[in-house]
């Protein structure tokens, strides 16, 4: 999809961002989505080709997705996400099935599951993956495009949950988790959904990574912020690539 800022448009969306950052570590990655038979779709293919990014983008009879992005004074984004677009209608294809059966890790979110078509495809893809593959649920709550059912079903399928400090409070309220601290809520989710790991990002404070046996906290480096759009995908892609390359939890986190 295209993130449309006041100053112009940029390719966005968690699949592209995650796949790009995983590829920076020398791993084979592939962005999976759908685009329209339109100029915006053509431009996405051209951009992906220019950047050497592998993709499986199905052409469908819906417009290519766009998101209107505005930044507040702290460069934190708010989104107006167009509905009824191509990525709401990702079809399951033989090529996608073959990709799933050869996949070591997948990162999926809640937003693309707002439509029945894409939700069915995402869940079918996950179910076709090898038993020992990693399933990362990067929750990415946006506006009203999530339900308790989508969140719970996704966490049940996942090995790793990636969530931020705002989202974890929403999930805790949704699931009637009474623990107050972010860390304790993470522990509840670990146990309740039999997760291997929870990654909790806390903006400019830092980030937690928790398993049943260990935990790690790393402060966020002090930097000049231009925009936080895609920051979570960058973090997740880099962390997961490090884990796949055999680094320890602490090494991957740092």
Give, region by region, the residue ranges found by the protein language model:
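Short, conserved phosphate/pyrophosphate- and ester-handling motifs at nucleotide-, phospho-/glycolipid
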Residues: 22, 164, 232
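Conserved phosphate-binding/catalytic region of the ribokinase-like
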Residues: 175, 179-254
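Active-site nucleophile and cofactor-binding loops and adjacent substrate-binding regions
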Residues: 7-15, 33-36, 58-61, 229-230
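Positively charged, low-complexity intrinsically disordered leader regions
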Residues: 1-6
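Conserved N-terminal subdomain of the carbohydrate kinase-like
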Residues: 28-110, 131
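Alpha-helix C-terminal capping segments
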Residues: 17-28, 241-246
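Conserved beta-alpha-beta core of the PfkB/ribokinase-like small-molecule kinase fold
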Residues: 105, 109-188, 205-207
């Amino acid at each position: 999809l295209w993130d449309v800022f006041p100053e112009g448009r940029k390719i966005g969306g968690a699949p592209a961002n995650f796949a790009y950052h995983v590829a920076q570590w020398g791993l084979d990655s592939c962005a999976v989505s759908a685009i329209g038979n339109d100029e915006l779709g053509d431009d996405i293919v051209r951009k992906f080709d220019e950047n050497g990014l592998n993709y499986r983008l199905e052409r469908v009879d819906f417009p290519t997705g766009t998101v209107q992005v505005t930044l507040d004074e702290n460069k934190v984004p708010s989104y107006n996400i167009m509905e009824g677009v191509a990525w709401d209608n990702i079809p399951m294809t033989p090529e996608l099935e073959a990709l799933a059966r050869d996949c070591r890790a997948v990162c999926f979110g809640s937003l693309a599951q707002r439509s029945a078509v894409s939700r069915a495809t995402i869940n079918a893809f996950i179910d076709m993956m090898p038993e020992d593959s990693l399933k990362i649920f990067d929750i990415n709550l946006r506006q009203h495009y999530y339900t308790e059912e989508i969140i719970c079903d996704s966490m049940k399928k996942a090995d790793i949950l990636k969530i931020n400090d705002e989202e974890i409070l929403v999930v805790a309220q949704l699931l009637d988790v009474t623990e107050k601290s972010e860390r304790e809520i993470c522990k509840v989710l670990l146990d309740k959904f039999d997760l291997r790991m929870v990654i909790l990002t806390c903006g400019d404070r830092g980030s937690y990574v928790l398993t049943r046996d260990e935990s790690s906290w790393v402060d966020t480096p002090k930097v000049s912020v231009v925009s936080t759009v895609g920051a979570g995908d960058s973090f997740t892609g880099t962390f997961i690539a490090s884990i796949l390359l055999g680094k320890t939890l602490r090494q991957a986190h740092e």
